[in-house]
């Protein structure tokens, strides 16, 4: 398998997707923010001074998905049909669990948009809680599934 983002001289290029037929594309990505017990309880009780951490992070994730081509150089600007983020508190692992779903009818996939959404949501959790905990860990940023396109479907086995 060859890398598609390099030209014959080995220089970076944006892949031409103009000849591809549009198809339904979906991607689901995840991320996790590991917290200490005190920070977890603050989020749970709504006691973080900057506001509702999970709601703000959800909105930030949507905004991040929409700005993906501004952040990832070879990522095509696409017309996203839907972005859905869910953030939940996992008491057992003392973490915020983030799932981002992105969909479109297009010529290229939405994996980067889903990954960016999950990442930006995680960064927002960190930003909103850094006054009370600086050693939070953002982890497990990963593609969980994708469908559509010439490379077919993918589902992570966890």
List where the protein language model places each region.
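C-terminal binding/interaction regions
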Residues: 1-54, 59-76, 82-158
């Amino acid at each position: 398998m060859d890398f598609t983002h390099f030209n014959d001289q080995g220089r970076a290029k944006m892949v031409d997707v103009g000849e591809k037929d549009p198809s339904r594309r979906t991607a689901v990505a995840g991320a996790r923010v590991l917290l200490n017990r005190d920070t977890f309880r603050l989020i749970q009780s709504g006691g973080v001074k900057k506001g509702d951490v999970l709601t703000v992070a959800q909105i930030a994730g949507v905004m991040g998905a929409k700005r993906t081509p501004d952040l990832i150089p070879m990522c095509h600007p696409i017309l996203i049909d839907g972005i859905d983020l869910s953030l939940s508190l996992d008491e057992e692992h003392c973490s915020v669990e983030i799932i981002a779903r992105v969909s479109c009818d297009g010529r290229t996939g939405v994996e980067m948009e889903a990954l960016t959404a999950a990442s930006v949501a995680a960064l927002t959790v960190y930003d909103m809680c850094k006054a009370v905990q600086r050693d939070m860990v953002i982890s497990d940023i990963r593609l969980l599934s994708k469908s559509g396109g010439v490379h077919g479907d993918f589902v992570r086995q966890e």
